[in-house]
Amino acid sequence: MTRAGRRLAVAAGLALAAFIAGFVVFAVAVARLAPAGSVRADGIVVLTGGEHRLSVAAALLSDKRGKRLLISGANPIATRHDLFQRSGLSADLFKCCVDVGYDAHDTSGNASETKAWASANHFSRLIIVTSSYHMPRSLTEFGRAMPEVSLVPYPVLPRRSQNWWADAIKARVIFSEYVKFLPSAVRFAAARLTGLDEGAVAGGNEMRASTVRGAR
């Protein structure tokens, strides 16, 4: 093997080792995430998905941890009544204080949808509710879209989150999320270094507040 070939092999090996080490750090970190006990904010945002996210966010609203709740990225076939039944909230509280966004199809879309909602309601501090493994990428996308808004993570923990290495399905989910998180983190860092936020980068694609359906 030539000297250049050896250098390339060493560089590739170091890159692979760094990638694997990064995954282990990421997996351990998300397994240790825990929701804050007495968190409060202007609004609450839940990113639709499994792990009882909606019921957790609804409990925060019921406990008056925020003024309004946005359900971001709701399935188009899910009606407000469907979401109401799943939330466990009273009819009056759901009617007055829950908004439903149907336009987000990924985490970046969640960030855009939330930015429009927060702006329309003049909110500067938000509680973000999503699964623990999805939280790092959510915070980077939301932070890039709304650098002026304070984000409070409220992770929903999966069962046996500490034993992710013993569950092939869970480990695969965390690995997939890690792979998605890396480019998101790079975009976040680049936006910070260049002084650009999501609105400046993709202002023409920003979702309007009117796309979020509320009771008002």
Range-by-range predicted roles:
Residues 16, 20-23, 130, 175-178:
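Generic intrinsically disordered, low-complexity segments enriched for polar/acidic and small residues
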Residues 2-6, 124, 212-215:
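Short, intrinsically disordered low-complexity segments
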Residues 2-35:
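N-terminal type II signal-anchor transmembrane helix
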Residues 167-197:
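A transmembrane-helix-recognition feature enriched in membrane-embedded lipid enzymes
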Residues 18, 22-25, 93, 122, ...:
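Intrinsic disorder/low-structure terminal segments
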Residues 191-216:
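Short linear elements at protein peripheries
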Residues 28-168, 175:
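A structural signal for short, hydrophobic/glycine-enriched beta-strand patches
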Residues 89-96, 173-180, 197-204:
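A general structural signal for short secondary-structure boundary/capping elements
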